[in-house]
């Protein structure tokens, strides 16, 4: 098939997947494991039905749920900043300001889950993310429809509709995956059964931008 006349144009929101460099991946896991007794619980500001939700970084307004703190080194910040910047550039967003709002880790065990939700930081506009830090050897028995596994899955739900639209994304997640998507893109994590644990990181980057200024940018 000759595709020399092909060009790609899409309407709607996008999810970008990156691979985390091994050094960044190791640093984050090391901080979580060695600093665990010092980590601030993040449960009060999250919707997850998860016991172990802990914050690594917060730079939003002080409130009764969380105060400012940081356990991440500069090279990790720089890597996050580069990836969020790439997302905005790839989506041709212009004239924006970014502010790194928060980073936390969810460590999930059997039957725990994250219901469908969206994110926000200090602003309602911005980018969220999911980084896969650890996975169990198995997500357990699929009690039905084993050919379409759901246990332990991340599902990201798009807001586009109409013929031929991709309305959801359910990747075959692997350790060191890093997914970036807009704050208002709904997503969920299904429970699994059996031994082991599933450790993921979420990071929120506030993005101040003018949607009118960005309308029709190409």
Identify the meaning behind each predicted range.
Residues 93-99, 141-144:
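Short acidic alpha-helical/loop segments enriched in Asp/Glu that coordinate divalent cations
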Residues 104-180, 196-197, 211-216:
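Catalytic core of non-heme Fe(II) oxygenases with the double-stranded beta-helix
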Residues 186-200:
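Ligand-binding loop in jelly-roll beta-barrel domains
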Residues 1-95, 111-114:
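Non-heme Fe(II)/2-oxoglutarate
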Residues 110, 185-186:
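Short beta->alpha connector loops
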Residues 16, 101, 127-129, 199-203:
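Hydrophobic residues positioned within well-ordered beta-strands of beta-sheet architectures
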